[in-house]
Amino acid sequence: MHTIDVVYSDTAKVNQFYGAMYRASFLPREMSDCNGDYPEFSTGITKHIDPSLLSLHSSLKKYGDFSMWDIYRAQLPLYNIVVPTLSGRMMQSLVDMYQEGGWLPIFPCWNSYTAAMIGDHCSVALADAYAKGVRNFDADKAYEAMRKNAFETPKSFAEYKNGMGRRALESYLRYAYIPLEDSVKEAFHTCEQTSRTLEYAFDDFAVAQMAKMLGHDDDYN
């Protein structure tokens, strides 16, 4: 909270600002214990990291409960500016989720994939972090995950139902939008096609920018 010093005559406004900063630190939260144990993403199986490595390489710490649809616009970009090292640890946790579960999550909460909300905003978070100079995460593996979400769908309905991959991606790739006639199976709301299209368009912009920054010119073009 002391990363930003505010000097202003209205103490109520200053208190309001720091109160907001404090609340912005609640989530995402650290999932790894001090002894090195952490629950593997999507399975909950206990994994272990040598505590001595945790003290030497804090990037190994695991973070979870990314209410992504709510935080990708403001909170995470703020982290990139004021606590970039912490942001990198969180971005690496997203990459780890992809490696452990096979897909970059849409809305990772309760240490699991969920089908909550629309969009694919982990891609935006990762691209924004890299664009702002955050480097303590595996950007190449992050891009691999982002690209997979943008072009592939789960092979089984069980995976799709569990929240893996983008919903209605087939229609989106075919038409460049999601028509109202696509009922979007397992969606919380059945009339969100326009909103989903807009969110995916922004997500794809982020994927394209990541491709450009990493030198994947064919993908970018």
Which residues does each predicted region cover?
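Alpha-helical support elements that line or immediately flank enzyme active sites
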Residues: 19-33, 70-87, 127-132, 205-216
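Active-site cavity-forming subdomains of large catalytic enzyme subunits
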Residues: 98-221
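A conserved hydrophobic secondary-structure block that centers on an alpha-helix together
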Residues: 4-10, 61-65, 71-77, 81-104, ...
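Acidic/polar, glycine-enriched structural segments that form the non-catalytic walls/loops
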Residues: 1-62, 96, 103-106, 135-136, ...
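Short, mixed-charge, low-aromatic patches
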Residues: 45-49, 80-84, 182-185
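Extracytoplasmic/secreted proteins, especially bacterial periplasmic and envelope-associated proteins
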Residues: 12-19, 73, 86-89, 93, ...
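A generic structural signal for ordered alpha-helices
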Residues: 52-56, 65-68, 72, 104, ...
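Short helix-capping and inter-helix turn/linker motifs at the boundaries of alpha-helical repeat units
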Residues: 11-12, 52-53, 65-68, 116-117, ...
